[in-house]
Regions:
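Bacterial signal peptide processing site
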Residues: 4-7
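N-terminal low-complexity, Pro/Thr/Ser-rich intrinsically disordered segments
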Residues: 9-42
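Short beta-strand edge/turn micro-motifs at domain boundaries
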Residues: 27-29, 35, 147-177
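Core segments of small alpha/beta cavity-forming domains
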Residues: 33-104
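Surface-exposed, charged secondary-structure patches
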Residues: 90, 94, 100-141
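Solvent-exposed loop/turn segments at secondary-structure junctions
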Residues: 139-142, 167-169
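Glycine-rich, aromatic-bearing surface loops/beta-hairpins
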Residues: 175-189
Length: 189
């Protein structure tokens, strides 16, 4: 006899994916070259002037890696940029182009507090265990807001920044009118 019931055993519930809106645990802030960076239970576990490594294999670890690696590669002083490139940036045409340009300039001092960005949060727009795309929100002393789109890839048991291909036409950084980060991380001023 047929009934109107529904047998869930034929179609078990689909397990929920990772929570892309969950904030990283135990976040504290450390200074790197004049910019405060978030570190916490999801990484980096190892941080020194020459490399920041040891991020959890999770959306939160990917987001922290995207933020930390983007700032560190941008502000790395002359004596550390090659080591940061080796440990924090994934191999590829983007890394090669960045290294070729980086060797032509010199960074000796921290960012000027009058112009330094302040990390405000992020939105994970894509995540799987091999790659994540993160929109990083920063604000500046003049009140402007920037969104840097960064991609990290899981390589050698850690998240590394994959720099855009030099021929890419989509800008990595854009201006935003509002702070629309899904996960708010407020660096101290």
């Amino acid at each position: 006899m047929g009934g109107c019931g529904h047998d869930d055993s034929e179609h078990p519930p689909v397990p929920a994916g990772p929570d892309l809106a969950a904030a990283p645990a135990d976040v504290r802030w450390v200074n790197y070259q004049g910019v405060r960076l978030p570190v916490g239970a999801d990484g980096p576990r190892n941080i020194d002037p020459s490399a920041a490594t040891g991020f959890s294999h999770s959306p939160q670890g990917a987001a922290l890696a995207a933020i930390v690696h983007t700032v560190r590669m941008s502000l790395a002083p002359d004596e550390h940029w090659a080591s940061i490139a080796a440990h924090e940036i994934a191999a590829g045409a983007g890394k090669d182009a960045w290294a070729s340009s980086r060797v032509l300039l010199s960074i000796q001092t921290p960012a000027d507090p009058a112009t330094a960005p302040r990390v405000r949060g992020y939105t994970l727009t894509d995540y799987n265990p091999a790659t994540a795309r993160v929109e990083i929100y920063t604000s500046f002393p003049d009140g402007s807001i920037a969104v840097n789109t960064a991609t990290v890839v899981w390589v050698a048991a850690d998240w590394r920044l994959r720099l855009p291909d030099p021929d890419a036409t989509e800008p990595a950084v854009r201006e935003a009118a509002t702070l629309d980060a899904v996960v708010r991380l407020e660096a101290p001023q």
